[in-house]
């Protein structure tokens, strides 16, 4: 049995408190002080040799979500589209560094500053580090 991790990140924008970074220069840059994440992990049989991280995200602002695997030496970043739901699959390393009953910890390393500007000037946004642990080793085993 291989492990698939589902991460749902929804309602990231308007319901949260948005704080302007500064009234100088980058007045169109906003930060996210908090984030709501629902993480579900299930055990399923896969034809692949390694588990896959499935990320489903929907947001009404533009930003980049950084994920880090604390027990696996890889990382990834995602572009969160404005008002567009997106699903991305990230394969974990083929060489298992953990047992079947142990899921690598997933840590939300940070989310980039949200820009009201068009995506063409998106690189002007500066990332902030939330360093907030979302989940660690939660497993639900379905044996059938």
UniProtKB/Swiss-Prot annotation:
Annotated transmembrane regions: 72-90
GO cellular component terms, semicolon-separated: membrane; mitochondrion
Membrane topology: Single-pass membrane protein
Keywords: Membrane, Transmembrane, Transmembrane helix
Location relative to the cell: Membrane
Family: To yeast YCL21w.
Protein name: Uncharacterized protein YIL060W
């Amino acid at each position: 049995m291989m492990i698939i991790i589902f991460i749902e990140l929804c309602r990231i924008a308007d319901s949260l408190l948005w704080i302007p970074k500064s009234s100088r220069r980058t007045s169109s840059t906003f930060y996210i002080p908090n984030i709501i994440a629902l993480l579900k992990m299930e055990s399923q049989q896969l034809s692949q040799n390694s588990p896959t991280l499935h990320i489903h995200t929907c947001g009404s602002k533009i930003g980049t979500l950084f994920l880090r695997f604390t027990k696996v030496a890889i990382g990834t970043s995602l572009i969160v589209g404005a008002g567009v739901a997106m699903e991305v699959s990230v394969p974990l390393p083929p060489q298992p560094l953990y047992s079947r009953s142990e899921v690598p910890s997933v840590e939300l390393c940070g989310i980039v500053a949200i820009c009201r500007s068009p995506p063409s000037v998106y690189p002007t946004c500066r990332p902030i580090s939330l360093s907030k642990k979302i989940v660690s080793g939660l497993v639900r085993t379905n044996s059938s």
